[in-house]
Each structure stands twice: as C-alpha cells, then as structure tokens.
Amino acid sequence: MKERSALAIARRMAELGEQGHAVTAYTLALADARDRQPDIELEAALYLFEHGGNYKVAYDTFQSLYRRGFQREHLLELMTQAFYLPNVKLLKSRYEKNCRLLRKYPYCFRQDFPAFEDLPLRFYPYDDESYLPFSVKAETFGERLYPRPPAVSRNFFQNLDKPVLAADVYSQYELEYLRDNVRKSEWVGRENHVYLHYTDWGIFCAYLQILSLRPLLEEEKLVFLIEDEISQYPIDFQARFGMDYS
C-alpha cells in the first residue's frame, strides 16, 4: 500500500478535529512543498497560524509567498490584520512621543514631521526583538530588523581630531553606545557633540516608530543633521549658541 502523504494526513486529521496531529502533519507538508507548491504552502501555513502551530513558521511562509508574487494582495491583508494592526497604536504613540521630544530638543533643526499615516515605512513586529520593515511605496518587505542588536557595526572613532560624525544610525544599541562612550563637551574642554547625519528625512521619521529617544536626549550630546544640513558640521557652539567649552 502506498504511504499516505503528509498533506493527505493533515487534511484528514483536520477533518476529524485532531488539531495536534493536523499541526504536525501540516508542518511536514509545508516542508515538502516549500518553494515548489505555493498553494499547498499557503494552506499549510494558514492552518498552522490559525490552529496553534509555530506562528513564525507561518509568518515566514507568508513573507516568502508574498515576495514570490503569490496572492500578494491577500497575503498583505492577512499579515497587516494579524501582525501590524494589533501593534499600530503602540507604534503611533511612540512615533508621536519621539516627535514631541525632538520638537523641544535644541539640536534637531528640522521640524516638519509627517503625519503617522504618511510615513514611508511600516514596521510589522516579528517577535519581541525584531520587525519586518515594509516600504509603502514599493510594497516590499525588507529583511528582519533588530533595533537592539548587541553589537557595534562600525568604527565611530576614526578621526579623533573632530567630533564624531555618523550617518544613518538606526540601531538603538549603537545610539546608546555613542551616548555612553562620548564624553560631554564640558568634560573635555572643547566641542564634542555626537553628530548624527540622516540622509533621508522620511526614513528617519519612520524609524521614530521603533526607537526610544528620551534616554538619548537627556544629556543633549546628540546633534541631528538632516540631509543637506550636513554642511553645518561641525557647529561653532560658541558663535551659534553662546557656549564656550574651553
């Protein structure tokens, strides 16, 4: 007798209400179909998602199918309803809180923050530590993003003769690293702020959904330069703000 396929077993177990066995069989069926049979992949992933299977396995499958162009509209709606909308209130609250902080911050010179609904990126939570960024214009998902990777990705201190200048730092961990490892101007007797250059205002604003700025701004070490504001680096704090650190 020919051995029954994992998919056939999964469907039969689902019919009988044997949820645990169906989840196991659908997990095997998904592995068998991966990258080859998108209709079966979707069937299996939906069952796992809706009946207590590993949600990450289902989530990864939804993303994979979407990227491969399979039922994109349906899958985007599914992922939005399941993963984004339950968290949108928190994302919006964090964004608006960070905007309020930057409006009061003396060294953020651009203030035309877009409405939350107009941001170019949406962040779909993946787990407690990571997100999937989604480009609204391109309708594409990027790679998983970890705001707090416990590592520094670059050398911020290549030129010690000038204040630190770093471009497009979107890691909470690295921002806190800079805050903690650059001494205040008052302590070193010269201008020693950390200059953060962001090359795209919309993208910078989008990341305010997932960053926590309050602990970064308290000591006023950071200077935010947006796009062509890079021409202001380094700022003469004595001439502009009346601060003499010598």
Locations of regions flagged by a protein language model:
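N-terminal donor/sugar-recognition subdomains of glycan-related enzymes
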Residues: 1-246
